[in-house]
């Protein structure tokens, strides 16, 4: 049964490593959460290691710059591991061919360029008709578009049998008060249209393996933290590690209106419907 806690400090002594989600836990895309930052700093001061693990489609250097601009200090984390990092390696390995149709915003171009990997030179972005595969980092304009805007183009690509690499398995994200679609929503549509989608972020294994390599750990007392039941919590369950579900993020509307602490009965009913049982739940990371 999921235990509701009031702070990370209540259980911190039981863990050596945190895999902590960023968006919805440490910031909301516009502002950082000071209490979450303080909790991570305290964990590290106690000797723990923190990997900020995000399904952002961009390499870690771009994400580091983003969170620095939001005033997330470097002493709150040991490393940043992104879905983009894991997916980038797969793309450079030729998993979806060398000539790819890129679906995503200009801000995501670092996915193709921000790397010392010499294999990057072999990847060429081309028009859909010339592509051997599809690389989705997001929507072209996530502020105004929905997956429905891509139905025709993705249907054609799926009909040609093009594999699709999804650089961000998230379906939606909250940007301030606005909910936006992510690359995962397009990959989901692609599969519904009969296409093949490849995933590398949470809840899939490659991003956890990469995080462990970067932290220099090989299992043990690990704890995952996140507000995505189908990504953060599902990933923790698949990895066989404990988790904290942050209920004041994506699932806040189902928890009784109090983002600081979920209502016990509502949480239990919702988790039962989702078919997942995180070890702990907390309103906001603190």
Model segments located where?
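Asp-based, Mg2+/Mn2+-dependent phosphohydrolase catalytic module
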Residues: 2-20, 27-46, 61-81, 85-286
């Amino acid at each position: 049964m999921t235990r509701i806690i009031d702070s990370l400090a209540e259980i911190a002594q039981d863990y050596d490593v945190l895999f902590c989600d960023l968006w919805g836990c440490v910031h909301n895309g516009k502002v950082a959460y000071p209490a979450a930052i303080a909790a991570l700093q305290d964990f590290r001061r106690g000797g723990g290691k923190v990997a900020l693990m995000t399904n952002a489609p961009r390499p870690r250097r771009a994400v580091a710059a983003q969170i620095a601009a939001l005033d997330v200090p470097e002493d709150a984390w040991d490393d940043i591991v992104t879905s983009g990092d894991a997916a980038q390696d797969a793309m450079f390995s030729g998993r979806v061919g060398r000539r790819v149709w890129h679906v995503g915003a200009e801000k995501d171009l670092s996915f193709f360029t921000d790397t010392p990997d010499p294999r990057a030179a072999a990847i060429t972005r081309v028009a859909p008709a010339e592509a051997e595969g599809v690389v989705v980092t997001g929507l072209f304009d996530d502020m105004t578009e929905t997956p429905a805007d891509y139905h025709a183009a993705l249907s054609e690509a799926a009909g040609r049998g093009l594999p699709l690499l999804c650089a961000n398995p998230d379906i939606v994200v909250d940007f301030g008060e606005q909910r936006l679609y992510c690359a995962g929503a397009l990959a989901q549509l692609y599969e519904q249209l009969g296409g093949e989608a490849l995933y590398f972020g949470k809840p899939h294994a490659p991003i956890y393996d990469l995080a462990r390599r970067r932290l220099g750990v090989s299992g043990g007392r690990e704890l995952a933290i996140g507000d995505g039941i189908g990504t953060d919590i599902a990933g923790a369950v698949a990895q066989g590690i404990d988790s904290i579900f942050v209920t004041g993020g994506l699932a806040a509307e189902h928890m009784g209106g109090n983002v600081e602490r979920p209502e016990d009965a509502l949480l239990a009913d919702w988790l039962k419907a989702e078919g997942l049982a995180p070890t702990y739940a907390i309103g906001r990371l603190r």
